[in-house]
Swiss-Prot record:
Signal peptide: none annotated. The chain crosses the membrane at residues 90-110, 115-136. The lineage of its organism: Eukaryota, Metazoa, Chordata, Craniata, Vertebrata. The gene is pex16. Residues 111-114 are peroxisomal. This is Peroxisomal membrane protein PEX16. It holds the Pfam family Pex16. It comes from Xenopus laevis (African clawed frog).
Length: 340
């Protein structure tokens, strides 16, 4: 009985893989539909927030699954080795589920279980990132861990490769690629070199080796990235020691983030992906204005006043400002929205 259900599940899995490979656009629309459903559910009934977050997490997992299928089938060779890719994937799964696990644990077992779940998730994420940093030398680690696939670029690449392979043939003995007469340009527009079947493959995909591989950070750069990885653990431990109303956890976390960014800014020859991630971390320093206790003491009254003025006096902005005012208290209570 179990073997029969397993075979059916495997057949369904294979059919879904074939669907994603043949219809990448349809897979993208499916992900967008699930994500839109999460927005429609929010606020509709008593447990809508938990269900909405579950649906939203499912959309992220679906996108991760579909990207993995397309990478495996359409990219040759795969961008990274198998074990490293698996670690990045598990890290992506944790980041996709962390908010739902937090609010689910709080709903089912109370506040202590919520903080236990937060600590376990942060420990798992830190362990995975430390292994990636010191064992696989991935350099500055981005968020999300697995870069979303440029599906349009992959499809264009596959079409171009198909056209290129059909417009020339390769000699059996010489292994030289020769254009067919029908696809040869006129003499004044022709390049007199052999056609390159795989030319520009990485550039068309929008990724180069320099973008995909981590840079050599050196001792200070590695230390800075380790500080960034361990900052959530340090913050949680200081919260447990000093309490949630104390300024010490907030100041310690801010100091660690600023130190990490300052040291990484001195590292040269960063890849494009790493430079984007570093700019993202600089921007996220603004989040400290929305993190307690700074938010409770300074930002909250000013921000709510600004939103109220925008909603009352700027036509059309009330549709955005008023729901945002209602959602801010909920957002403040969820750790991974603020500190994740």
């Amino acid at each position: 009985m179990a073997a029969r259900y397993w075979d059916k599940l495997r057949d369904l899995s294979q059919k879904y893989k074939e669907y994603v490979i043949q219809n990448p656009t349809g897979a993208t629309q499916l992900e967008s539909g699930v994500r839109m459903l999460s927005y429609l559910i929010a606020g509709r009934f008593a447990d809508s927030h938990e269900l909405s977050e579950l649906v939203y997490s499912s959309s992220n997992l679906l996108a991760l699954l579909n990207d993995g299928i397309l990478r495996k089938e359409l990219l040759t060779p795969p961008p990274t080795e198998g074990s490293r890719r698996r670690l990045l994937t598990w890290l992506g799964v944790l980041e996709s589920l962390e908010v739902f696990i937090e609010i689910g644990a709080a709903r089912a077992w109370g506040e202590r279980s919520r903080w236990a779940a937060i600590l376990i998730i942060q420990l798992l994420k830190a362990c995975l990132r430390i292994v990636l940093l010191f064992w696989y030398r991935v350099g500055i680690q981005s968020s999300p861990p697995v870069t979303p696939l440029d599906r349009e670029g992959i499809l264009n690449q596959a079409e171009d490769n198909s056209k290129s392979s059909s417009s020339c043939f390769v000699g059996r003995r010489s292994s030289r690629a020769v254009r067919s007469l029908n696809d040869s340009a006129s003499s004044h527009r022709r390049f007199w070199r052999s056609p390159q079947i795989h030319e520009g493959k990485q550039q068309k995909n929008g990724e180069t080796e320099n973008d995909k591989e981590g840079s050599e950070l050196g001792t200070l750069g590695t230390l800075a990235e380790a500080i960034h990885i361990l900052r959530p653990i340090t913050h949680l431990l200081s919260l447990a020691a000093c309490g949630q109303k104390s300024w010490k956890p907030w100041m310690m976390a801010a100091a660690l983030d600023i130190t990490s960014i300052s040291l990484l800014s001195d590292v040269r020859n960063l890849s494009r992906r790493e430079r984007i991630e570093l700019r993202r971390r600089m921007f996220l320093l603004l989040y400290y204005l929305l993190r307690s206790p700074f938010y409770n003491n300074y930002t909250e009254t000013r921000l709510l006043l600004l939103l109220r003025l925008l909603g009352d006096y700027v036509p059309g902005l009330g549709l955005v400002a008023r729901p945002l005012m209602d959602y801010l208290p909920v957002w403040q209570k969820i750790y991974f929205y603020n500190w994740g």
